[in-house]
């Protein structure tokens, strides 16, 4: 019997498994797909390196970078290429995001005064944030409401919506600022003005590595290294968990009977002392429905958005724009049909053959859920129609790839933190049952890595307290 069954082989599940293995806890990981990694997927196509999902690790959240270093990939981490500039579309033009900002929020007003991204009225309203009192109500608030209240409607439209909500493929008026950007609400509570607080901070010297790192072969390298670090017999692909069964309460059992069984669509019934569900919240809901309807209902309430990534390659001569940055985001009011675009060959070294460019467009999300109903050809045409006038693209692409991510973007909307607390209270009724992944605590790679490893630590501690054999410091046969 395995001590732990991990259901789900995305980055959170793999990180959980890695930490369990590091602590000497026996486990088996079940992944319904033909490969591990979830939305982290990189492909090598005709000399191009295409990230179909996320392409970067955030330096300010070092958990992903630290894991790469542990996996022996530290010397392969590469920074973004200069100039490290992102753009925002307004009025059919691309405007550089003003320097001296934290996720678009100014740390100095000077660069914002000179930009053409905002009207003078909008700039004055942003500067007036210095005099906006802190909100007394400690209740949850949307990103849109927070930014409008503090910086004005123009900042909400052209900064918060494409940047803060856009990176989560969400609705700015529904996403929770407390769940996704707790730093902002904490600064407001402690200092009142965000502008004043950020201006008082010592001026940070940008690392020579910049704000983001990746790997030469894309972030898929990280997934391959994680899989290689685990015992081969511990990962079972193309295995769908269909039901979770509680055999008994999770107190120590002198007969070493399993506390749980995970039933698979192939007819197996796998015993375990503990189970971690590293699955989307709606899948978690289905698995726990038979043992706790309230927990299932809570998990089912977590909304998800579907997105598509459309990758294009062109000859360099076919693109008039200098592509002097990492890409651009598109405010909803622009109505172009895409959320953003990333210039991969300008952002990272060696992503395209010489005299070629590689870029991606992002489509769908909570802003445009019907886009996911389009065919691949329609998604590609929509994306190309949005890119062509902005970048001066002539001719047909040399390469086109469409990657669909159905219900893959968890939406931490207003009320998410209260729901998460209720989920954790419900889990307390089932010792030995754990959840992790983007539907619960954190949505990016660093957060999922951190939460997966923390969950593994909790499992190891719980097994040790329960005195489960082979729980810690002793490896099963598969782990030797």
Where are these regions (language model features)?
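Dinucleotide-binding Rossmann-like beta1-alpha1 core, especially the glycine-rich loop
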Residues: 46-134
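N-terminal Rossmann-like FAD-binding beta1-loop-alpha1 element of flavoenzymes
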Residues: 2-29
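Active-site/ligand-binding neighborhood in enzyme catalytic cores
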Residues: 105, 109, 122-243, 249-255, ...
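Glycine-rich FAD pyrophosphate-binding loop
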Residues: 21-45
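Conserved Rossmann-like nucleotide-cofactor binding loop
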Residues: 12, 35, 282
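Mid-domain catalytic core of redox enzymes
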Residues: 23, 237-359, 366-373, 377, ...
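Conserved flavin/dinucleotide-binding core of flavoenzymes
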Residues: 98-100, 322-325, 339-480
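Hydrophobic anchor at the start of a short beta-strand
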Residues: 25-27, 275, 397-400
């Amino acid at each position: 019997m395995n001590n732990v069954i991990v259901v789900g082989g995305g980055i959170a599940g793999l990180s959980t498994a890695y930490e369990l293995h590091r602590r000497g806890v026996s486990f088996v990981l079940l992944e319904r797909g033909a490969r591990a990694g979830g939305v982290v997927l990189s492909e090598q196509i005709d000399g191009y390196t295409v990230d179909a999902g996320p392409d970067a690790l955030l330096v300010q959240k070092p958990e992903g970078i630290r894991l790469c270093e542990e996996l022996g990939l530290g010397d392969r981490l590469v920074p973004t290429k200069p100039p490290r500039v992102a753009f925002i579309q307004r009025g059919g033009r691309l405007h550089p995001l003003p320097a001296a900002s934290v996720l678009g929020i100014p740390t100095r007003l000077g660069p914002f005064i000179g930009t053409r991204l905002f009207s003078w009225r909008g700039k004055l309203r942003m500067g007036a944030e210095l005099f906006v009192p802190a909100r007394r109500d400690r209740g949850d608030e949307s990103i849109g409401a927070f930014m409008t209240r503090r910086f004005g409607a123009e900042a909400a439209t052209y900064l918060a919506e494409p940047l803060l909500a856009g990176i989560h493929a969400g609705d700015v008026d529904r996403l929770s600022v407390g769940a996704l950007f707790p730093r902002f609400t904490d600064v407001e509570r402690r200092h009142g003005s965000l502008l004043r607080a950020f201006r008082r901070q010592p001026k940070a010297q940008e690392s020579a590595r910049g704000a983001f790192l990746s790997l030469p072969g894309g972030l898929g390298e990280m997934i391959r290294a994680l899989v290689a670090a685990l015992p081969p017999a511990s990962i079972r692909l193309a295995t769908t968990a269909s039901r979770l069964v509680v055999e008994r309460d999770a107190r120590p059992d002198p007969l070493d009977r399993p506390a749980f069984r995970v039933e698979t669509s192939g007819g197996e019934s796998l015993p375990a002392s503990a189970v971690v569900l590293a699955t989307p919240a709606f899948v978690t809901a289905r698995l726990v429905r038979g043992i706790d309807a309230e927990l299932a209902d809570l998990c089912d309430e977590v909304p998800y958005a579907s997105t598509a990534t459309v990758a294009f390659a062109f000859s360099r001569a076919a693109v008039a724009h200098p592509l002097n940055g990492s890409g651009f985001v598109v405010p909803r009011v622009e109505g172009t049909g895409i959320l953003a675009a990333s210039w991969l060959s300008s952002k990272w070294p060696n992503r395209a053959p010489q005299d070629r460019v590689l870029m991606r467009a992002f489509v769908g999300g909570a802003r445009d859920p019907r886009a996911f109903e389009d065919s691949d050809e329609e998604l590609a045409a929509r994306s190309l129609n949005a890119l062509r006038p902005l970048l001066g693209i002539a001719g047909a692409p040399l390469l086109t790839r469409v990657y669909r991510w159905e219900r893959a973007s968890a939406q931490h909307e207003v009320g998410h933190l209260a729901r998460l607390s209720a989920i954790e209270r419900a889990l307390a009724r089932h010792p030995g049952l754990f959840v992790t992944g983007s539907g619960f605590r954190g949505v990016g790679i660093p957060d999922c890595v951190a939460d997966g490893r923390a969950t593994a630590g909790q499992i190891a501690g719980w097994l040790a307290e329960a005195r489960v054999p082979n729980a810690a410091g002793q490896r099963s046969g598969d782990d030797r």
